[in-house]
Design a protein with these regions (language model features):
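GHKL-type ATPase core
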Residues: 1-118
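GHKL/Bergerat-fold ATPase module in large chromosome/replication-associated machines
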Residues: 90-197
Length: 197
């Protein structure tokens, strides 16, 4: 959100939680209003939770804001995949001033996404893995908590490999792809050896 704040002509953030509605407004990256009074807090009758962010790209930062709608759709879909059971709503204003809305939600996250992609014509049922572990990037660095979520299956008709890190799709795979491939190869090798093959 910080990068969006500084690259926006304006950005309005509204958060509903704990029976309140919190609002904060930015222009050109700066908070609108005195620092201590910038955050508006209003009681909310609803048990609503969630966040709404409305912003406009700053034309001094972006020389062209003609971004294809499919890019937004794909980005929202990918966020729904890695944030299970969270609904992302895309609202696009048409030339007539009317808004079209499209929701993206995968209740079981990556598991539902894989099933959507492969359908029912698979060789093996999708296998879902979720684990919390400790890990480190190098020997000289401290350990940290790692949450791993994976889903895989073999299909007769569809091939896909996607990798995500910190809710971001890694178009070119990167280190998480190398780690996943290495771990899968190691696990399959260990299983084959345990079967005496």
């Amino acid at each position: 959100a910080c990068a969006t704040q500084y690259a926006s002509e304006y950005m309005d953030v509204t958060v509903w939680r704990d029976g309140n509605k919190y609002s904060l407004h930015f222009k050109k990256g700066k908070v609108v209003g005195a620092k201590k009074k910038a955050l508006e807090i209003e009681p909310s009758d609803e048990n609503r939770t969630g966040t709404t962010i409305k912003w406009r790209p700053d034309l001094e930062v972006f020389t062209s804001i003609s971004i294809p709608h499919d890019w937004y759709r794909e980005t929202m879909r990918r966020q729904a995949v890695v944030n299970a059971n969270v609904t992302f709503r895309l609202r696009i204003e048409g030339d007539d001033g009317e808004f079209s809305e499209e929701d993206f939600c995968y209740p079981k996250g990556i598991e539902d996404y894989v099933l959507e992609k492969v359908g029912t014509d698979y060789l093996t049922e999708p296998f879902f893995i979720e684990a919390d572990r400790r890990g480190r990037d190098r020997e000289d660095l401290p350990d940290y908590n790692v949450k791993i979520t994976a889903c895989m299956c073999f299909s007769r008709t569809f091939m896909m490999q996607e990798y995500y890190h910190n809710s971001s799709w890694l178009e070119n795979g990167g280190s998480p792809e190398k780690a996943a491939r290495s771990a899968l190869t190691s696990a399959l090798d260990a299983y084959i050896k345990s079967q005496g093959k």
